[in-house]
Amino acid sequence: MANYTAADIKALRERTGAGMLDVKKALDEADGDAQKAQEIIRVKGLKGVTKREGRSTAEGIVLARTENNVGYMVEVNSETDFVAKSAPFVEFGNKVLDAAVAADAADLDALLAAEVDGKPISELVTETGALLGEKVVVRRVARVAGDHVAVYLHKTSKDLPAQVGVLLAVSGADAETAAHDVAVHIAAMSPAFLSEEDVPAETVENEKRVAEETARNEGKPEKIIPNIVQGRLKGYYKDVVLVDQDFAKDSKKSVGQVLSEAGATATAFARFRVGA
């Protein structure tokens, strides 16, 4: 019988993210040699790649950082939260983020073609999935540039790394504090657009049409319907447009007002939430 302890099993599980039964089988096959067992898990994982292709990857983490006034953010996914919080998966996520920064990647195709340690990210994805015994994916990347870029990462569970991330670019010499506060606001309130001008015209027209039809169905006088439509459109903007939203820390002010008082202007943002 192979000579290994419960501590050996725990350590190998933490290194590989593999299940307990798979770890014990690998240690048995390797006569208790942890390095050999890790290689056995990796090889068996590679053989199972095709079987994992159709599996759902609803768990994961978000990682972000800035470099020379440019913010980069990536979302990487796994099948289970056990793997998502494992050291190998977090290391994988950091390598993906490093590649995004090095390649100045602004879209997923550019990121997947980027290299880490002499190999493309797409190959690293396959190897990591083999090691962990789960399907892993690089879901998306964001690049935001500006005079100042704030980064905010939020943990939705104390047991997991960050699963919500925000990049916010602002202009203005003394905008750091306001930028951080607004980044936290974005994480909580999930705006869809930076300004009213960013809302697609067809979306605006649809909101107007719905508001008009609703007003008529409610029997409102025809002469006041245009005012009702404008009022409801304003309410829609307040829900989805960042600068129009009530500021989370002080609902008496809009986000736009908070930025203006700090001498700042928001120029771009990105928000990721795992699975959303």
Swiss-Prot record:
GO terms of molecular function: translation elongation factor activity
Pfam families in the record: EF_TS
PROSITE patterns: EF_TS_1 (PS01126), EF_TS_2 (PS01127)
Compartments, record wording: Cytoplasm
Keywords per UniProt: Cytoplasm, Elongation factor, Protein biosynthesis
Domain of life, per lineage: Bacteria
One annotated Gene Ontology cellular component of this protein: cytoplasm
Functional description taken from the UniProt entry: Associates with the EF-Tu.GDP complex and induces the exchange of GDP to GTP. It remains bound to the aminoacyl-tRNA.EF-Tu.GTP complex up to the GTP hydrolysis stage on the ribosome.
Family assignment from sequence similarity: Belongs to the EF-Ts family.
Protein name: Elongation factor Ts
Species of origin: Kocuria rhizophila (strain ATCC 9341 / DSM 348 / NBRC 103217 / DC2201)
Gene expressing this chain: tsf
